[in-house]
Regions:
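Loop segments that connect adjacent transmembrane helices in multi-pass transporters
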Residues: 101, 110, 116-125, 194-242, ...
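Helix-to-loop junction immediately C-terminal to a conserved catalytic motif
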Residues: 406
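Transmembrane helices of ABC transporter permease
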Residues: 24, 28-38, 52, 66-69, ...
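ABC ATPase nucleotide-binding domain helical subdomain, centered on the C-loop/LSGGQ "ABC signature"
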Residues: 101, 336, 355, 415-417, ...
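Membrane-integrated ABC transporters
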Residues: 1-44, 58-70, 84, 88, ...
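ABC-family ATPase nucleotide-binding domain "signature/switch" substructure
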Residues: 400, 433-437, 441, 449-454, ...
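Cytosolic ends of transmembrane helices, especially the final helix of ABC transmembrane type-1 domains
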Residues: 221, 245, 293-322
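Hydrophobic alpha-helical segments in the permease module
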Residues: 70-81, 174-182, 247-261, 280-302
Length: 602
């Protein structure tokens, strides 16, 4: 949204977005508004009933009838108010739930690139805080604006019936109050948006600092990080104070203007009573209407403030809903044929065990338009069985290659094939169901040991889980835990090396066809590394294992080693072949102090 857009252009999409959240629950809103209208009608009728009682008293007539009606109306209004507020409360909770469900679903459908553009703390704030503001705007405030408007109109009509001249004087004052509020509203809306954006920025900064708390403390950077976060906190406070001040100005103008209008009406009405143009009971009823007019006008101003906050929240939620998502719609015929190809590929392994499971055909990829390509004209065939290792200096394109395989990134040119079928003809889920991935910074999924290992394979049996844990030398550790597989994992009961082993176990529990390892042995001891190498060797006999290596000792025995530099594959071969033919590979080996002779002998 450009800064030059008019307020109307900025607000209309937000109005539509607000309605999009209300629409599934519109019948609840309509029912609430009907109840609210009946409640407003009861309130509008009461001053007129009081006038009838006063007239009856002045004329010496019985007041039993009007008093009974007034009492019944008060009880009826109380019941209506209870049902109305209960219904609006349920509607508000439902709106929040549906908004959060929509945003969370979008997060998990979004591309990696669109998620990475924003701090995770800010994304969390949009789900937790912005949806609460949206709730107030789409349920309570939206209904109250209509009800307040109806109450104001109904009250003004009754005031006109009582005394048109006195009404015109009162209405003139209200018009001035409304005009002043309309002038102040846009600035207040801008302040509300800046306030919410600053809260999101603060949340993102704090989340990042807490995530790196060990590094912060080890670097003695507590004070510096505190000050950085306080800069954002002070900025948030500044915008919040600005928004509060603007809201206070609106309230003061509306409330003060209403009081002045009522005082003027009282003075002018007293003059008309003295002139014989208005009865005392009529003036009393008129003043009751005037006082009754103040709450809906003030409520209207407050609701408009809430809706302005809702617009700001809606705008931030709309940004989430516009995040680029991974395409999942694919032509059914193509998908069917692709799946057939997959089945053929699986069955053909016994016939052609070294046929490629994954292929890169002249692939070029970049992270942003106009940037330098991260991969250039890469041709690559990964056999359906065997261990393929990828090495190279930082920035060579190793992680980019994995991102392409996992469809976190799309090729700009060329084609990626899964058993002969182009990626472009396969759904994301179909591709990823064939792969298992262990990333370099291995996260533990919130939950238990069991839920972590069942994360990619919910059908895993307990025996399969224990087999996977045994393979990475974690069986004894988990059995020693108080709750075994049902132990909840936290940063305090799992070390970095154990996190990495859990990630490897999570990947191998379902015996994947293609296992992608991004330096899976970086934080484990030599004994466990040997165990994982055994797992890799075993998996490579029946499937494909692809390893990104920063420690060449983990890939010396690979069937094929790819050497990458500046986005290209500059050499490929076995360890011994590359030691003889490629200077860069020899430099990498020397830099890491790997004894080539010992490795070859092993």
């Amino acid at each position: 949204m450009g800064m030059s857009d008019s307020p109307a252009k900025q607000s209309w999409p937000n109005v539509r977005l607000l309605w999009s959240f209300v629409r599934p629950n519109r019948w609840s809103l309509y029912a609430g508004m009907v109840l609210g209208l009946l409640f407003a009608a009861a309130g509008i009728a009461m001053p007129m009933l009081i006038k009838l009682i006063l007239d009856a008293l002045a004329g010496g007539e019985s007041i039993a009838g009007p008093a009974a009606v007034l009492g019944g109306l008060l009880v009826f209004a109380g019941i209506l108010g209870f049902v109305y507020h209960n219904l609006m409360g349920v509607l508000a909770a439902q709106v929040v739930f549906e908004a959060r469900e929509s945003m969370v679903r979008r997060y998990f459908r979004a591309t990696i690139a669109s998620i990475a553009k924003r701090p995770s703390g800010e994304l969390v704030t949009r789900v937790t805080s912005d949806t609460v503001l949206l709730r107030e705007a789409t349920s309570t405030a939206l209904a109250q604006v209509v009800l307040s408007g109806v109450s104001i109109i109904g009250t003004l009509v009754m005031m006109t019936v009582l005394d048109p001249v006195l009404f015109l004087v009162t209405f003139g004052g209200l018009v001035l109050v409304g005009a002043a509020a309309a002038v102040l509203m846009p600035a207040m809306g801008r302040s509300q948006r800046l306030s919410q954006e600053s809260v999101g920025k603060l949340g993102g900064r704090l989340e990042g600092a807490l995530h790196a708390i060990r590094t912060v403390k080890a670097s003695r950077a507590e004070s510096r990080e505190h000050e950085r976060i306080m800069v954002d906190a002070r900025e948030s406070r500044r915008h919040s104070v600005s928004a509060a001040r603007r809201a206070a100005v609106v309230w003061a103008v509306v409330s003060g203007g209403m009081q002045l209008a009522i005082a003027g009406s009282l003075a002018f009405g007293a003059w008309r009573v003295g002139a014989g143009a208005l009865e005392v009971s009529g003036l009393v009823a008129f003043l009751l209407y005037a006082f009754q007019l103040a709450p809906p006008v003030a409520q209207l101003a407050a609701d408009l403030t809430t809706i302005q906050s809702g617009f700001a929240a809606a705008s931030r939620i709309r940004e989430v809903q516009e995040m680029e998502v991974e395409e999942t719609d694919t032509d059914d015929t193509v998908v069917s044929e692709s799946l057939d190809n997959v089945v053929v590929g699986l069955s053909s392994r016994t016939i052609a065990p070294v046929a490629p499971v994954l292929e890169f055909v002249n692939v070029t990829a970049r992270y942003a338009p106009g940037s330098e390509p991260a991969l250039r004209d890469v041709d690559l065939a990964i056999p359906s069985r065997g261990h393929t290792a990828i090495v190279g200096p930082s920035g060579a394109g190793k992680t980019t290659l994995f991102s392409l395989l996992l469809r976190f990134l799309h090729a700009e040119d060329g084609e990626i094939l899964l058993e002969g079928t182009p990626y472009s003809q396969l759904p994301f889920d179909q591709v990823r169901s064939r792969l298992a991935y262990v990333e370099q910074e291995t996260p533990v999924v919130p939950g238990t040991v069991r839920s972590n290992l069942q994360f990619t394979y919910p059908e895993a049996t307990e025996d399969e889980i224990w087999d996977a844990l045994r393979a990475v030398h974690l069986e004894d550790t988990v059995r020693a835990m108080e709750n075994g597989l049902d132990t909840v994992l936290t940063s305090t009961n799992v070390s970095g090396g154990q996190r990495q082993r859990i990630a490897v176990a999570r990947a191998i529990v379902r015996r994947p066809e293609v296992l992608l390892l991004d330096e899976a042995t970086a934080q484990i001891d030599g004994r466990t590394e040997a165990a994982i190498q055994e797992v890799i060797t075993e998996l490579a006999e029946t499937g494909a294992v692809v390893t990104i290596a920063h420690r060449l000792s983990t890939v010396i025995d690979a069937d094929t080693i790819l050497v990458m530099e500046k986005g290209r594959i500059r050499a490929r071969g076995t360890h011994s072949e590359l030691m003889q033919s490629d200077d860069l590979y020899r430099e990498l080996v020397t830099a890491l102090r790997i004894s080539t002779d010992v490795a070859l002998a092993g």
